[in-house]
């Protein structure tokens, strides 16, 4: 984890591998201009072609007497067009350049804070989170990687009051510990991150933090609770399912209680409805919802927010053998509702249904938010940059959108179209697990909503199928697991304290 430090002036700054000077579009930032006497011979020729456009970067060598070996000219664009997301993406791009240049220690000069259209807090959150997002290294198994980049180890931010800035940096670092945990769990081998291993990670959180209590139900306990849908999905696997319940109590006397549910399919072959080989290559990431829940809870415990949150992860493989659950058969969930299986590859909604029922029975939730890499239809609809979500409560939906805007984790609300619910009709069961071949993300959400029908609990379903994992580098994320959802939900939970 990179260490951040703030100081008001650059006079006594420490030596570093690089110094970053900010520039507006076709205009010097005043704080950068104040360093011209020190660096002008080095960067003046480069300014002839440097325009200061958003994300524009010029990497130069410094003068021999300077404290930094390299000078980086950083374009911030136009001040009047600056947003927190622009700041996030700009400093994320900067981080990628610095890592490739093997600059481990960096001094970053801020533009004049009082002249920004953003607040100091918004700018610093965007800066630190952009750096932290791209300063992650995913687990590697190769002995030698000659292209390995050098991660940033220390960033000194110059031009801000340290007391305020350092508090922001500590908060973002704690949040990204949770993001990194989520990414690590998703990126590792499916043979390593089994349902049992996810349970061990959850149990270790309980050992590390007094505010966390973890309970794990094994196969027999799952059967005792009559979670027939989770058991059905697990039938084809040689590893047992685990049902993980992690309770964080930051405000024990309060009745307000958020339940987070994460899909925990640690590998998804599709079952008897077997996926094509190419589609199966990334299916170790089908537990990203569960990993997101663990990342949120670990960060909550570090931040010590005065709030009550329970995380629930139904964890299993969706594997294939002679015992696999079969298309056309009917299984009964914990709710007592029966489901006709039309596709064994629509397994995520089945295990989430049992988790929702468990939450309603045992947790007395004020609200339920679930996370799942649920449908390919969502990827087709919104791509890999935006997660779609559904909600039965307008206040919850608006609060999630507010947190989304603060954290550069784009969410888009989709409708729960009642008319489409009829596509789930079954002649032999209470419902089918698959609707028509259209509006697949909506019908999946409608399936989940059926298990909340008699409840007044506010609910949101985040389909992170497109955003959880990227096979190439993105503006906001490194390659592979993104940890999408950890930051926005933590901001949502923190914001709820003032409402």
Swiss-Prot record:
Positions bound to Mn(2+) 2: 263, 268, 286, 347
The UniProt record lists the keyword Hydrolase: yes
Similarity annotation: Belongs to the peptidase M17 family.
Requisite cofactors: Mn(2+)
PANTHER family to which the protein is assigned, alphabetical: CYTOSOL AMINOPEPTIDASE, LEUCINE AMINOPEPTIDASE-RELATED
Example of a GO MF term: metalloaminopeptidase activity
Enzyme Commission designation: 3.4.11.1, 3.4.11.10
Cofactor note: Binds 2 manganese ions per subunit.
One biological process term in Gene Ontology: proteolysis
The organism's place on the tree of life at top rank: Bacteria
Catalytic activity: Release of an N-terminal amino acid, Xaa-|-Yaa-, in which Xaa is preferably Leu, but may be other amino acids including Pro although not Arg or Lys, and Yaa may be Pro. Amino acid amides and methyl esters are also readily hydrolyzed, but rates on arylamides are exceedingly low; Release of an N-terminal amino acid, preferentially leucine, but not glutamic or aspartic acids
Gene Ontology annotations for the cellular component aspect, listed alphabetically: cytoplasm
Keyword entries, A-Z: Aminopeptidase, Cytoplasm, Hydrolase, Manganese, Metal-binding, Protease
Protein name: Probable cytosol aminopeptidase
Segments crossing the lipid bilayer: none
Keyword Metal-binding: yes
Active site: 275, 349
Function recorded in the entry: Presumably involved in the processing and regular turnover of intracellular proteins. Catalyzes the removal of unsubstituted N-terminal amino acids from various peptides.
List of residues binding Mn(2+) 1: 268, 345, 347
Location of this chain's protein in the cell: Cytoplasm
């Amino acid at each position: 984890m990179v260490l951040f430090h703030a100081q008001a002036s650059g006079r006594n700054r420490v030596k570093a591998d690089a110094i970053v000077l900010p520039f507006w579009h076709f205009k010097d930032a005043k704080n950068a201009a104040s360093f011209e006497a020190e660096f002008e011979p080095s960067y003046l020729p480069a300014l002839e072609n440097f325009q200061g456009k958003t994300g524009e970067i010029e990497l130069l060598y410094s003068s021999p007497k300077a404290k930094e070996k390299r000078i980086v000219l950083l374009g911030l664009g136009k001040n009047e067009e600056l947003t927190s997301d622009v700041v996030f993406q700009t400093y994320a791009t900067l981080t990628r350049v610095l890592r490739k240049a093997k600059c481990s220690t960096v001094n970053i000069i801020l533009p004049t804070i009082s002249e920004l259209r953003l607040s100091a807090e918004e700018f610093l959150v965007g800066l630190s989170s952009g750096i932290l997002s791209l300063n992650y290294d995913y687990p590697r198994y190769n002995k030698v990687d000659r292209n390995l980049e050098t991660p940033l180890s220390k960033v000194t931010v110059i031009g801000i009051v340290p007391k305020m800035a350092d508090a922001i940096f500590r908060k973002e670092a704690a949040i990204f510990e949770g993001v990194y945990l989520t990414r690590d769990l998703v990126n590792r081998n499916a043979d390593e991150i089994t349902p049992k291993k996810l349970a061990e990670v959850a149990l270790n959180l309980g050992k590390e933090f007094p505010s966390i209590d973890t309970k794990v139900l094994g196969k027999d306990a799952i059967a005792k609770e009559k979670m027939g849908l989770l058991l059905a999905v697990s039938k084809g696997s040689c590893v047992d399912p685990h049902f993980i319940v992690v309770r964080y109590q930051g405000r024990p006397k309060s009745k307000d209680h958020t339940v987070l549910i994460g899909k925990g399919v640690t590998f998804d072959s599709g079952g008897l409805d077997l996926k094509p080989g190419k589609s199966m290559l990334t299916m170790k990431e089908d537990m990203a919802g569960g990993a997101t829940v663990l990342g949120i809870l670990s960060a909550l415990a570090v931040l010590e927010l005065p709030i009550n949150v329970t995380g629930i992860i139904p964890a299993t493989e969706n594997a294939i053998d002679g015992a696999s659950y079969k298309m056309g058969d009917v299984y009964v969930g914990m709710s007592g509702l029966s489901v006709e299986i039309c596709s064994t590859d629509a397994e995520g909604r089945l295990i989430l249904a049992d988790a929702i029922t468990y939450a309603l029975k045992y947790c007395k939730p004020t609200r339920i938010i679930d996370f799942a890499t649920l449908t390919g239809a969502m990827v087709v609809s919104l791509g890999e940059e935006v997660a779609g979500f559904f909600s039965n409560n307008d206040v919850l939906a608006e609060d999630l959108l507010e947190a989304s805007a603060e954290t550069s984790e784009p969410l888009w609300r989709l409708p729960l179209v009642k008319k489409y619910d009829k596509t789930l009709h079954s002649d032999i069961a209470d419902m089918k697990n698959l609707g028509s071949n259209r509006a697949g993300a909506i019908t999946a959400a409608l399936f989940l909503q059926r298990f909340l029908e008699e409840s007044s609990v506010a609910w949101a379903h985040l389909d992170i199928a497109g955003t959880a994992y990227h096979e190439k580098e993105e503006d906001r994320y490194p390659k592979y697991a993104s940890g999408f959802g950890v930051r926005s939900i933590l901001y949502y939970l923190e914001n709820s304290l003032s409402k």
